[in-house]
From Swiss-Prot:
PANTHER family xrefs: LIPOPROTEIN YIAD-RELATED (PTHR30329:SF21), STATOR ELEMENT OF FLAGELLAR MOTOR COMPLEX (PTHR30329)
Keyword DNA damage belongs to the record: no
Annotated membrane topology: Multi-pass membrane protein
Signal peptide: 1-20
Protein name in UniProt: Outer membrane protein 41
SUPFAM superfamilies: OmpA-like (SSF103088)
UniProt-listed InterPro entries: Bact_OuterMem_StrucFunc, OMP_bac, OmpA-like, OMPA-like_CS, OmpA-like_sf
Length: 391
């Protein structure tokens, strides 16, 4: 009989240990950004403005007969855009300048062509996509594609001898962090601008930018620029943790410790020696153990899965008529003044549930809020909390 009891105990212990193993899931900060969910940023967050200067040149046909260095003309660009995630952005770029065209076997004939253009681009940060997200990363590699419009003209008269065309644009940018809000950027891009919408004609009724032999070509342009990128508004993204694995691991550890204690107690003798009767002295003291109500990032709405804690608090107050204290907190993300207001809203939201939903008398509730000046827990996410305790 003892052998059977021992075997059953061992089998049960093995099964219980297997069911309470720790979750060893990597933290979001260790995963590539493509595998992490990020909170949606606000409308005014993660905007940027880029100012650049550089050179441009025409390619293909007789243009290639001229040495590249002799083809270069000065250009400038202005870009305004926004990052929608750590690795995806859109922008509008306006650029313009010189892009002279060359004819002849040696490119001896030069035509003073200039341009002004605008294109809308879709940008992809390769480094942020494949690496764990860090707002202070030094280097970024950002290829992009876009579509736009270009106005080409000869000489200095914008409206004379001109061509209006759609463009297909492609390029790559390298960004080097200089500070929280400034990057040094280098960019190379190409524009196919032979998708003509309209064109002017010369005195001979021949379209500008054309010649009978088909040697004149002004439809493929390369550009290289460098400059500064300025970040505007709130900078960076916050990862969303769907569950707190550290808390789950801690709870599993407590379960395993309790099971070990139960197993140890089961080894003690069934019978105990007789003890003299002692008249119990009963002293009742009503104390509420601390109850924690957790909140989502930048939220003061009480989630449904937190209502059980507030129900327990309400039952305690109704049964004992003891006063309680409600204290709101916030994690250190953001500025101190905002966190102070956020912790106040969280504390008052808990009071509203206690009084409005569960009928706790308001005169038995004291309300406090401490912003991020006090962090009751070592883990950042746990401090998005309201703690309820006996007064």
């Amino acid at each position: 009989m003892k052998v059977k009891y021992l075997m059953l105990t061992l089998v049960g212990a093995i099964a219980l240990n297997a069911s309470a193993q720790e979750n060893t899931v990597p933290a979001t900060g260790q995963l590539p950004a493509k595998n992490v969910a990020f909170a949606r940023n606000k409308a005014g967050s993660n905007w940027f403005v880029t100012l650049q200067g550089g050179v441009a040149a025409q390619f293909l046909n007789d243009n290639n007969n001229k040495d590249l260095m002799d083809r270069l003309g000065a250009i400038g660009s202005l870009s305004v855009g926004k990052y929608h995630s750590p690795f995806f952005a859109t922008r509008l770029q306006i650029n313009g300048g010189q892009a002279h065209t060359f004819l002849g076997k040696n490119g001896e004939q030069e035509i003073n062509t200039n341009f002004g253009a605008a294109h809308f681009d879709f940008m992809f940060d390769v480094v942020n996509y494949f690496a764990p997200y860090r707002e202070n990363r030094f280097f970024h590699l950002i290829p992009w594609v876009g579509v736009g419009y270009q106005h080409k003209f000869i000489g200095s008269e914008w409206s004379k001898d001109n061509v209006e065309s759609l463009t297909a644009n492609v390029g790559v940018m390298m960004a080097f962090r200089l500070g929280k809000r400034v990057d040094f950027v280098i960019e190379a891009q190409a524009a196919h601008s032979n998708l003509n919408l309209s064109r002017a004609y010369n005195a001979k009724k021949t379209p500008v930018f054309e010649d009978p032999a088909g040697r004149y070509y002004n439809g493929f342009q390369g550009m290289a620029t460098a400059g500064l990128n300025f970040r505007l508004g709130a900078v960076g993204f916050n990862a969303i943790e769907p569950m707190d694995y550290a808390l789950i691991n801690d709870l599993n550890g407590q379960i395993n410790r309790l099971r070990s204690e139960v197993e140890e107690l089961s080894k003690r003798p069934v019978s105990c020696p007789e003890c003299p009767e002692v008249t119990p002295v009963t002293k009742t003291e009503n104390i509420l153990t601390e109850k924690a109500v957790l909140f989502r990032f930048d939220s003061h709405v009480v989630d449904k899965d937190q209502l059980i804690n507030l129900y327990d608090v309400a039952q305690f107050v109704k049964e004992t008529n003891e006063p309680i204290t409600v204290v709101g907190y916030a994690d250190p993300t953001g500025n101190t003044q905002y966190n102070e207001k956020l912790s106040e809203r969280r504390a008052k939201a808990v009071v509203d549930v206690l009084t409005g939903k569960y009928g706790v008398p308001s005169e038995l509730i004291s309300v406090e809020w401490k912003g991020d000046s006090t962090q009751p827990f070592s883990k950042k996410a746990w401090n998005r909390v309201v703690i309820v305790r006996s007064k």
